[in-house]
Amino acid sequence: MKTFNGTFFNLPPDKSISHRTALIGALSNGITEITNYSAGLDNQTTLSVLQSLGVDIQQESFLTNDGYEQRKVVIKSSGLWSLSRSKRELMCNNSGSTIRMLSGILAAQPFRTTLVGDHSLMKRPMRRVAEPLTQMGASIKLSETGAPPIEIEGKKPLSPIQFYQKIPSAQVKSLVIFAALHADGISEIIEPIQTRNHTELMLGLEPELQPDGSRKIVIEGQKNIEAKPFTVPADPSGACFLVALGLLSGKSDIRLKNVGLNHTRAGYLSLLREAGAKLPTENNRTIGGELLGDIIISNDYITKPLRINDAQIVSDIIDEIPMLAVLSAMATGEFELHHAAELRAKESDRIHALVMNLQRLGFVCEEYKDGFCVTGRTHNPTGTIEITTFYDHRIAMSFAIAGHFSNAEIQLDDNSSIAVSFPNFFSLIDSMQKT
């Protein structure tokens, strides 16, 4: 059995937080310094698009005291409405976060903009982007299928909105917040199922708990945002792959440093503990409103399959589900998931992608509209198994982890998507591996 060992400071910076620090920096009055900004392609796309809109952005690399490379981003802005019209279409590449959240800002600008992406992004649904922004007064045009390109004719100022978020989506919530910052009045967002709350924490928005358990977020429009520094923790979604690596080994000794432990992002740790893992955390502290700490995987493993049948839990672990599904199947032969239809609208139809590739590894799967289950394994194939990644970084990394514990040689049909969020994925695992 392979083992993996070491203390690691160089996990990728949090992808979600990196996007939001850059976007908020572009809306803030003054100089925003972001320490440990992500080098992933999605986050670099956000910077590139903001630069195309006239935002002054400088980026430099430096070595930490531990000898690891980090990036520092400095954004200079004069606040709301400081963007300028781009002379060309804005290329968002594969970044759904960029195209969706930026739409909320562009809806408030007094000019026309067109947002496009790569072949994968151009298939992703965007009607949930258009609906609230249209209600606020912007003109939004999509393709006939409701996908990009997104053509935005902004309105200054936007009208405030009372937005009830029927389908949980942190990106849609954030784009409405960004639009509401420019609105002429007070906007409210009602969130029945909580999604990741990084945007609210950065902007100092404190949700009001309602009698029915939902949360109300109140946004005052046209209020000056003063620039402030941000420090980005290590990405808990990226850490999940290394947690799974250690748990599948059962004999590893791994410490993952400075990982974000925000309760809306690290819910997978609680699930894995319920399945038998220990997974203690140490050195917990709060920086800029975000909880972070070190995750320990030491001679640890799960003893029970994961069964996920709660919409709030699904919202909390939406990005980790591919790795959790593969981990549970490989470790116990079983897995069950419901209330996760949102997975079909990610970089790929992740439900279909997981079922297809798990079946290639001999697992018995049943696919539902909102999830799937694994009910056993008919055989453990040998030889070479090709995994269809659908150019989805989380599918690619999940099955790359499985490859370390499979009788078959697992080959990814494409591993270039991994650079979207975890550029040093393979080199980091190589540095951990002891045979």
From Swiss-Prot:
Pathway: Metabolic intermediate biosynthesis; chorismate biosynthesis; chorismate from D-erythrose 4-phosphate and phosphoenolpyruvate: step 6/7. Its EC number is 2.5.1.19. The keyword Cytoplasm applies. Phosphoenolpyruvate binds at residues 15, 96, 124, 171, 350, 394. GO terms for biological process: amino acid biosynthetic process; aromatic amino acid family biosynthetic process; chorismate biosynthetic process. CDD domains: EPSP_synthase (cd01556). Catalyzes the transfer of the enolpyruvyl moiety of phosphoenolpyruvate (PEP) to the 5-hydroxyl of shikimate-3-phosphate (S3P) to produce enolpyruvyl shikimate-3-phosphate and inorganic phosphate. PANTHER family: AROM/DEHYDROQUINATE SYNTHASE (PTHR21090), PENTAFUNCTIONAL AROM POLYPEPTIDE (PTHR21090:SF5). This is 3-phosphoshikimate 1-carboxyvinyltransferase. The lineage of its organism: Bacteria, Pseudomonadati, Chlorobiota, Chlorobiia, Chlorobiales. The gene is aroA.
